[in-house]
Structures are given as C-alpha cells and as structure tokens.
Amino acid sequence: ANGQQMQRFGSYDLGAQNLQALAAADWRLAPGWTLLGSVQWSHLTRDAQRRSSAAQLNQDWSFATPKIGLNWAATPTTRLWANLSRSHEAPTFWEIVSATVAPNSPATAQAELVRLKMQRATTIELGGAGRWGEGAHAVHWTAAVYRSVLADELISTTDANGIKVGTYNYAGGTRHQGVELGLSGSQRVGTGALDVRASWTYSDFRFRGGEYAGNQIAGVPRQLINAEVLYRMGAWRFGPHVRWMPVSTPTDHANTPGAEQDAYGLLGRKLEWRDGPLALYVQADNVTDRRY
C-alpha cells in the first residue's frame, strides 16, 4: 500500500518443447461415403528451474492420438459425420508453477512446482453441416453431439476469495458431453442485408467418481447462447449482439447451494467496416451495465 516493492517469490526459468508427427489417409468407400483415419505422435517437455535455488522440475510425455471418422455427403448441400478419437493434454506452466498469495498477507506469498500427469480422453462425436438455399442468401447450419470420457483431468481449485489454490489430476474420472448448434445467414432488407448468426451450446461436464462424484464441474455454463443481428450497407455493418446464460452455474466443485453464478443476459453493440481481407470494428459489451 505504501508503494514499496514486495519480495520476489516466484522467479523461474521455463523451457518447453513440442515435437509432433502426423500420418493421415482417407478411403472412398462408395459414392458419398468416405472413411478417414489418422494418428499423431507427440513428445512434449516442460522444464522449470527456480532462479533462487537448485529446485527444478523437468517433465516429459510421449503419446499417440488416433482418430477414425466416417463422412457421408447425404446431399450436395448436406454432410454428416461420425468420429471416434483419443486426445491428450499436457499441463501448462500456469498449472505447473503454483502460487499461493493471501490477499490480506501478500508478504507470505510462495510458489512451488507441481508434478502433473497428462489429461487423457476418448471422444465420440456425431454431427452434420449444410445449407438451405443458394447463393449469398443461403442459410448455413451446423449441429454436433459429443461425449468424452476423461482420465486424470486437470482440475483447478480456488479459495473463498476466488484466488487460485492450485491444479491437480482428478483421479476419480470425469465426463464431458454436450450439444452444439449453429445457424448463420443473410437476407436482403431494403437497400442492404441483414446478417444473422446464432449459436447454442449445452454442456454437461461432471465428475464420474471420487470426492465430487456426480457433481457438475465448476465454471462450465450448462447452456450458453450467443447471437448477433447486423445490418449491412456496402462495407459497413452495425447492430446488436447478445450473450445469454439462461441457467445458473456452480462456482465450486462441491456445487454448494447458494454459491452459483446466477443466470444473466448481456446486450452489446457492434460497428464494423470490411474491405476484402481487411476488417475494423468497434464493439461495446454489456451496454445496459448489467451486474453479473
């Protein structure tokens, strides 16, 4: 509070390396049907050395991520697909270097290095994309449903003040599943056109076992809706956009009653100028000054 410099408590030299190799192939099984397969091999390293001592933590992971998919061109304007894949996610330095800073006692701040496993997942996805109509005023749509079963998910925790406490691998297993829908199009109105874009996501992310078995993973909105309606005249577009979270979201993994983030809706405005690949815009979010 008096402007004096605090002690340095987390000074590290960090080094990362990513090596990857990919092989992919596709086979046309029949008119409109294509089978796709790929496998990616990765080797990642994350090294951290504390500058003020000999403390260090060097970690590396090697893994393969296969994927197989089937595409069907149902019509000239409609494509459907099914995918089965494995994925891996290595921890970041933000998760490996864990800092503890008490708001009412910053002089006791400290940092430590945390050894973490890779997060692994198996995912199945069904989806489709297409359009209704032709030309510049066609309506485009996308839809997908997915389910992922995860092991050793990287879970972050915070204290009652919202300060990050740390990250660890959740041993009880987790599950991510949901639905994603998107719609976009343009319709002529007067001397210009009305560009519409909307998306809806439904996310059911839960702990499968362990301490929080059955609970919703904190901070992941169960439903989220984004939409914008922009009127276009020449190179200019302007109009409103909306971000709406229609249901409350838990803020802790224990799903404590009364500790949820309440549902909210935010209204914004956007002004955009576009000329070929160049675009400039001014955007104002939450123009109604809603607290959320």
Feature annotation, model-predicted:
Residues 28-35, 44, 136-150, 167-252:
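Gram-negative outer-membrane beta-barrel transporters
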Residues 17-23, 64-70, 80, 112, ...:
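Hydrophobic, lipid-facing positions within transmembrane beta-strands of outer-membrane proteins
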Residues 5-12, 47-57, 109-115, 164-171, ...:
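Extracellular loop and loop/strand-boundary signature of outer-membrane beta-barrel proteins
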